[in-house]
Amino acid sequence: RVYFVESNSSSLRNQPTSRIASNNLWSSLRLVALNQNTGVKIWSKAININKSNYPVVFFLAYAKSRLVLSYTTNRYYVDAYSSVSGSKVWSKNHSWNRDHHGGHMYHPLIVGDAVIVEPYGYKLSNGVVVHRGLPARGGCSTMSASKNTVHYINWDYDKGSMYFWDLNDNRRRLMVGSRSSCWLSLISGNGMILSPTASSGCRCRYP
């Protein structure tokens, strides 16, 4: 299946450009599921979001029969929908962890049966909080993840050292010898982690 959110606001059709600054973009929203082979619509559900101070970022992710919609205005909002029917299963919101260096626009991470939306991890099935106390990080330092591990740059970002947070045993390990960037240069897959150097062009100190 292919999932997406679309706006059916008729006023958008008269916009002179595809760069839409109008708050109408967030009106008449629908969550849609298509058959990936035929393009046939499987279901389409009207959804509502908090569009006060219209969203800064807007993400849709899928795992374990859940569609996770995450967005921010002056707070983080997390809505989980059934991928089978499109019905809402649970909804959460919480304040930003900080108001600088991208603290208002982190993307969600789905790790195992949890979705991490800073600074909490919610269980996919029911929205119960399963992770608190996410690593304190400096700079922009957003996180990426593999099946059971979260990768990030710690508070000592002037050294640029990467850390691994194993969610199975809650251990956090320092890995020295490479400097990743604050904004998603750690990519994992097939038992490996790819970390191209990111020491150039970053305004953070690099000894």
Where is each model-derived feature located?
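Short, surface-exposed beta-strand-loop junctions and turns on beta-sheet-rich folds
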Residues: 10-11, 75, 129, 171, ...
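Short loop/turn segments that connect beta-strands within beta-propeller blades
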Residues: 35-38, 82-85, 124-127, 166-169
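Generic alpha-helix detector with strongest preference for long hydrophobic helices that associate
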Residues: 62, 67, 167-168, 174
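A short beta-strand motif characteristic of beta-propeller blades
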Residues: 40-49, 87-98, 128-134, 171-176
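Repeat-blade elements of multi-bladed beta-propeller folds
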Residues: 1-30, 45, 49-79, 92, ...
